[in-house]
């Protein structure tokens, strides 16, 4: 009985049984200006302009997502996509992918593009469903 209650309680903490709502960054993020929003098939991509370093941007994004979201092992297709974005933008790239344990069907792919010529960095936050 105690074990059953413990399992039920732990599942409730992660939101199992509730439909996880995909994050929406339409309002922007602290220290980053939303430039545009693209919707392509199963994903919504938010494009930001920021003066924040990759580390600071990631900290703000993680705080916005909440403590249950976890960084995931990178998939090869994400790494290839990020490398191409970096090459086309002439920028250094930092890639992180987050996933919520309650819903493995939603991933957040974050690409931070560090400009080689200054402090005008860009970030792309893609909310990917059904991956």
Predicted regions and their residues:
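Sec-dependent N-terminal signal peptides
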Residues: 3-12
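An acidic-aromatic pocket/loop used at catalytic or ligand-binding sites
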Residues: 14-131
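Detector for methionine-enriched segments
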Residues: 1-3, 79
């Amino acid at each position: 009985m105690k074990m059953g209650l413990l399992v039920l309680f732990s599942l409730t903490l992660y939101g199992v049984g509730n439909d996880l709502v995909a994050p929406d960054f339409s309002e922007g993020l602290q220290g980053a200006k939303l430039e545009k929003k693209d919707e392509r098939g199963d994903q919504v991509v938010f494009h930001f302009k920021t003066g924040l370093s990759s580390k600071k941007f990631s900290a703000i994004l993680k705080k916005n997502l909440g403590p249950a979201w976890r960084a995931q092992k990178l998939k090869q297709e994400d790494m290839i996509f990020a490398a191409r974005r970096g090459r086309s933008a002439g920028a250094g790239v930092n890639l992180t992918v987050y996933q919520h344990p309650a819903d493995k069907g939603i991933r957040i792919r974050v690409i931070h593009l560090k400009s080689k010529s200054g402090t005008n960095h860009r970030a792309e936050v893609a909310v990917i469903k059904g991956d």
